[in-house]
């Protein structure tokens, strides 16, 4: 049994990160935009030309005032715009001006929702932001329906062609010629139900506590103070006894809700829906399942034989950010420019607190055109990789104004920056070597764990309702852990219930395959950098400008990188890791 893997799987946080890029459902025409020229050296964030300007001026995050959005007013305005478009009296220019103002309010609604979530996860005991986050979540389907109704009404109006020509773009309304997602009351109810279940899961994570030796204690504190492995696992067992059934029932309801939702939207399975509507993938669930099987057969044996890295050295939050700054200065280009922007507007939180939600993510405050990094640190060198990962998302969000729609493309930048950070800091020879070995082992482990998670999801969503029980889910997860070499059969029973801590299962179904395929692409960037210094960094920068509105395989082709689905690619990866580890 791999002790490190066991600790990772059982930790009360995500294995990698809870990345949550939010997508702009409407993209105005990108104005005249050219790639900045770094041939003369560094470019300040003040001089860097971004594709879009903020709707609200750049503001340091602590100074942003949260204001509950006027949803009633927004929905009423959108309805009025639709009526004006079909009334026959308003000119296209008038409709455009009204819609442009309403769209600013729509974006502000999404921004305030993200701000509420950010501030709630920063302090899960904050009842005000918990209530605001819940309220914004509850209002989302109502707002989206109002926006969809407005688009549908404009699509049926005599101004359709003029609106497309002057503002929306060619064939924009084509997707609104048929009934929309929010026109069906049951679909709306299912979306609301999914949001409510996700909120229940987040609340369940709010510093879970258990009865221990006659009094109530925080699980995280008990685990932190466990002096022996036996005591550590005993605490975990008590935690799963207390929370496993609750989380499991939430997940079962999510699966049932999502399967019905996919069916109502015309998809054969929820995987088909997620690939098409959520993640904009240009490969199929069938391709992903074959890929995961090759991970199992080719990489699991390598992982079983690989030597585990030593326990990582300690690293404070201040040191983590210091080294991340060094890496940005060393790498230069867009990475350095984005770091200047991050510092100028205080766009990160890496503080340590028992009240913070575990894990890390990068979000986007769209009204301000500002990415934001959230990290709950562990206090080791691993935090530098986590920070680099999230900063990779930040760089992409900053350069492209959040227009990288593909999850897989987005994850290439986050994982590639982890690799590029290796050797770009003043850690010293010993700690740099320690971090590199850890990263390569972690990379191999990423393939196995995320493929394991994906296989579990596929099996869970395939279960008929009669077999969809918490006990069956535990059994399936244990089987997957054994199949992918993460545990032997004797140890799998201990890990069987740990799936409830994988937040992606609850908040981002079928997401985890992105970690596998993007890790492959990111590793290719690292290999380029190792072969020819600067080549990997150039590939990273080139891909940044290929990513907006692209898809994963198309972006890799633009960058002359090998597809992860190439038949020989998994054998190449196995050979690489055998030599590296």
What does each of the following model-derived ranges do?
Residues 386, 390, 394, 398, ...:
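Catalytic glutamate of the conserved HExxH
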Residues 368-387:
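Short pre-active-site segment immediately N-terminal to the catalytic Zn-binding motif
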Residues 37, 387, 450, 454, ...:
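C-terminal, non-catalytic "cap/extension" segments appended to globular domains
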Residues 10, 14-16:
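Hydrophobic core
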Residues 348-370:
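Catalytic zinc-binding patch centered on the HExxH motif and its immediate surroundings
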Residues 292, 297-298, 400, 405-446, ...:
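Post-HExxH zinc-binding segment in Zn-dependent metallohydrolases
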Residues 25-319, 323, 481:
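A well-structured
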């Amino acid at each position: 049994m791999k002790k490190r893997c066991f600790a990772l799987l059982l930790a009360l946080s995500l294995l990698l990160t809870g990345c949550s890029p939010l997508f702009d459902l409407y993209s105005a025409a990108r104005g005249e935009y050219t790639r900045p020229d770094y041939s003369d050296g560094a470019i300040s964030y003040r001089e860097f030309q971004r594709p879009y300007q903020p709707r609200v001026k750049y503001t340091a995050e602590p100074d942003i005032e949260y204001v509950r959005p006027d949803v009633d007013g927004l929905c009423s305005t959108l309805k009025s715009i639709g009526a004006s478009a079909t009334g026959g009296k308003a000119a296209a220019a008038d409709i455009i001006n009204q819609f442009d103002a309403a769209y600013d309010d729509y974006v502000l609604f999404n921004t305030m929702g993200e701000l509420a979530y950010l501030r709630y996860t920063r302090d899960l005991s904050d009842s005000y932001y918990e209530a605001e986050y819940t309220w914004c979540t509850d209002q989302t389907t109502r707002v989206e329906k109002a926006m969809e109704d407005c688009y549908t009404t404009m699509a049926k109006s005599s101004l359709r062609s003029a609106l497309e020509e002057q503002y929306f773009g060619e064939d924009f309304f084509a997707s609104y010629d048929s009934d929309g997602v929010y026109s069906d009351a049951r679909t709306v109810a299912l979306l609301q139900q999914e949001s409510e279940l996700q909120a229940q899961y987040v609340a369940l994570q709010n510093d879970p506590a258990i009865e221990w030796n006659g009094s109530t204690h925080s699980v995280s504190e008990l685990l932190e103070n466990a002096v022996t492995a036996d005591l550590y696992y005993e605490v975990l067992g008590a935690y799963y006894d207390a929370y496993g059934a609750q989380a499991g029932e939430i997940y079962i309801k999510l699966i049932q809700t999502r399967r019905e939702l996919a069916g109502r939207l015309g998809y054969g399975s929820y995987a088909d829906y997620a690939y098409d509507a959520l993640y904009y993938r240009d490969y199929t669930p069938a391709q992903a399942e074959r890929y995961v099987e090759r991970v199992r057969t080719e990489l699991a044996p390598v992982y079983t034989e690989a030597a585990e890295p030593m326990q990582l050295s300690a690293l404070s939050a201040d040191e983590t950010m210091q080294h991340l700054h060094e890496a940005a200065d060393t790498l230069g280009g867009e990475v350095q420019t984005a770091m200047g922007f991050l510092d100028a507007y205080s766009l990160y939180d890496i503080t340590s607190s028992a009240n913070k939600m575990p894990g890390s993510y990068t979000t986007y405050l769209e009204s301000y055109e500002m990415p934001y990094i959230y990290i709950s640190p562990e206090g080791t060198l691993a935090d530098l990789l986590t920070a680099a990962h999230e900063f990779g998302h930040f760089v992409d969000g900053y350069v492209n104004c959040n227009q990288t729609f593909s999850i897989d493309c987005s994850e290439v930048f986050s994982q590639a920056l982890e690799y590029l950070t290796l050797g770009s800091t003043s850690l010293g020879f010993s700690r740099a070597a320690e971090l590199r070995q850890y990263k390569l082992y972690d990379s191999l482990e990423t393939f196995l764990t995320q493929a394991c998670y994906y296989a579990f999801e596929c099996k869970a969503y395939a279960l008929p309702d009669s077999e969809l029980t918490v006990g069956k889910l535990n059994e399936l997860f244990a089987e997957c852990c054994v199949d992918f070499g993460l545990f032997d059969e004797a140890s799998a029973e201990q890990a069987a219930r740990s799936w409830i801590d994988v937040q992606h299962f609850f908040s981002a179904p079928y997401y985890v395959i992105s970690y596998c395929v993007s890790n492959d692409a990111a590793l290719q960037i690292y290999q380029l950098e190792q072969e020819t210094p600067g080549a990997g960094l150039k590939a990273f920068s080139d891909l940044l400008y290929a990513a907006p509105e692209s898809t994963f395989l198309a972006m890799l082709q633009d960058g002359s990188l090998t597809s992860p689905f190439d038949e020989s690619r998994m054998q190449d990866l196995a050979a690489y890791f055998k030599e590296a580890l």
